[in-house]
Amino acid sequence: MSTSADGAYHKLSIPAQTHPSGCPIDHEFTTFTPDYLENPYPQLAKIREEHPIFYSKKLGYLVVTRMEDLREVFRDHDVYSSENVQDPVFPICDRAAAILAHEDFNPVAVMSNRQQPDHTRIRKHTQDGFSGRRMKILEPYIQRRSQELIDAMITKGGPVDFVSAFGHPLPGQIIFRFIGFDEADDEQLMSWTGNRLAFTWGNPDEDEQIDIAEKMMKYWRYCRTFVASRFKDRKDDLTSELLNAHEANSEELSYREVESIIYGHSFAGHEIVSNFMSNSLLCLLQQRDNWDAICKDPKLIPNALEEVLRFESPQTSWRRKTNVDTHIAGVDIPAGTQVFLSLGAANHEPSLFDSPAEFDIRRKNARKHISFGHGIHFCLGARLARLEATVAIKALAQRIPSLRLVDGQALDYSANITFRGPKALYIDWDK
């Protein structure tokens, strides 16, 4: 693993944590209980009102729940470092750590977990790849693949699992074409990105950790091989744009940084958007009048999707670490404190959103959510995620307006601290 000044992409050693003096302690709060996984929002509402900032003994994190405080943490990037956002939540076993300590596994921190001033330098070049021109180039592909996946569902006949038939493959295919990956590798790439979710944000057992570590190594080697091939043969894709920037000025963007950006983007652009699509369909179909409304008037879709991001965000938390001693909302916080930012709690804050537990596709301030972050680390792919979801939901509403949820299904959610979306979502329609 990299030991360069750039910093490793994943840091595997987790320093021991103690609760800040004078801060309330919750000995039971964790994101891994069945009740939290089924529906975290009642619990988040309770703790936000009783102790908006508290220390979770089980997670080893200071938990922040109010929108005002979250925005302050995101804004003050000199005090609150993002260096820990790609690190495993819990310690990993020695055998898994040894696999990732190999000199061949050396991605460096680049976007979500890189400190200033390097973050802005790297983001500037990566942002060029998310231009309006590239969105226009990609949109016809999104439309075509949406229609093809709908065709496949109709041909197969319902009921079908929306996640495996549409919600999971479509975002993967889009981000992989955006990066430039070979379509023949899609299935393997999708498997690798799911493994990274469990490793970094979940709590896998030792055997799972070892298996995931081996696959992460293969995934990193794949990314490096792919970038090397693009270096020799440029195309009209994100990787080629990054390599062009590197060649123009290697001090502005290093070759290893290009490799590491590709390693990170193929996960971020897949899992988060997959959850976004599945959560969107779930929320819209749970109340039939909402689905009927967007079928009748597709102009409602963009705001409805913002309400999904507020009400059932695909990313319910993020992390930070204090660089220096600081304080927030009257709580003194020592340097080195791990901070858990509860986006889900803030997005349901009643002082900001009327009747926050209600899903309202016409909510006027739905876009005030914080699901894409805030400040210099605001999600670079937000525009693409919104485009994908808008095209997909519009296509589904036009092609299959009789869509409905299969009655009696119990939704199962992946046990992790950050990402939220059903593992399966069964739907049916009139034949």
Segments from the language model and where they lie:
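Cytochrome P450
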Residues: 2-431
